[in-house]
Amino acid sequence: MNSLELKYGCNPNQKPARIFMADGSELPVTVLSGTPGYINFLDALNSWQLVRELREATGMPAAASFKHVSPAGAAVGTPLSEEDKKAFFVDDEGELTPIACAYIRARGADRMSSFGDWAALSDTCDERTALYLKHEVSDGIIAPGYAPEALEILRSKKHGKYNVIQIDPNYVCPAVEHKDVFGITFEQGHNFSKIDRDLLGNVVTKNKDIPEAAKIDMIVSLITLKYTQSNSVCYVKDGQAIGVGAGQQSRIHCTRLAGSKADTWWLRRHPKVLGLHFVDGIHRPDRDNAIDLYISDEHDDVLADGAWQRIFAEKPEVLGADEKRAWLAQQTGVTLGSDAFFPFGDNVERAHKSGVSCIAEPGGSIRDDNVIEVADRYGMAMCFTGLRLFHH
């Protein structure tokens, strides 16, 4: 099949709509279930590139959770701790496969933003991954293949309307790509820049020690940024994004946004949060919303009389400001990536507040000396990659 008609474009009034191969070749994607739309395919094709590159760069299964053409989260398939399982709502005792761990981590980066996400897997979707997705609110998935039992589970989701796309893993896009804006065609070379350990050799700080785990986290952050709407900053820990700041005009606002998401990720692991007792039958999105309010300054919205009884089996204690500050101060070993240089040292100051110890950014600012000075003040290791990763 060379062309696929779509219901509409970005909005219902934008018709006609389709995807097609301009060179007359066959589409490298097959719809196995549902009727994916225009934005679904944008998410699918961007997220597939991300997980494919993560797989190639790390040698580990990878997954992403996309919303509006940017990743809410991305991760490689390292095992989950018992604390991870509680935070990510892994309710059963079944063994988790690496690809299932990758998606659970990717979605767990920012569960609020991943509501109604597009899932992407670097490897065949197995039954364990499909079972986890079955209980999440999601729009669709792309993968290079599906185990029969996994496909059966996914096809039953959303009363048979869940979008399932299979992509040819051997497909390679053309070297030159085109995009029309206001009737004018833009042409550029595809971004084939390779992100691997070779990119991390120019360490510009006094601290030259970048542990192997941090190098993997740098790779995860940079590949995630490669497919995130610019400007963008990404915080990573233990092989998973824990905060993505996307599409901000100001670099410091990217760093603050991603940092606040990383803080939320860490606060969800506070003993008071992991110990919350919810009423029977409450769905995961409602739990996510309740936790988000509980750890915020608006906690009265879920703790007031008449409110908490609808959510919790017993009234939780307030998670106070001092408790949150003390807990956040324990966050360490975080890696940060930026899709372009830091123009001021304030970005490093903000990163430090969320436990960042290693940074990867292109360098090239006229204030690089100031940025390095601030990193040195906190004993961080920072490398200049020389590679900008804008994505639009």
Regions found by a protein language model. Give the residues of each.
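Gly-rich Lys/Arg/Thr-decorated short loops/hinges at beta-loop-alpha junctions or inter-strand turns
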Residues: 23-35, 109-115, 189-208, 285-307, ...
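Conserved helix-loop functional segments at active or binding sites
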Residues: 53, 227, 264-268, 353, ...
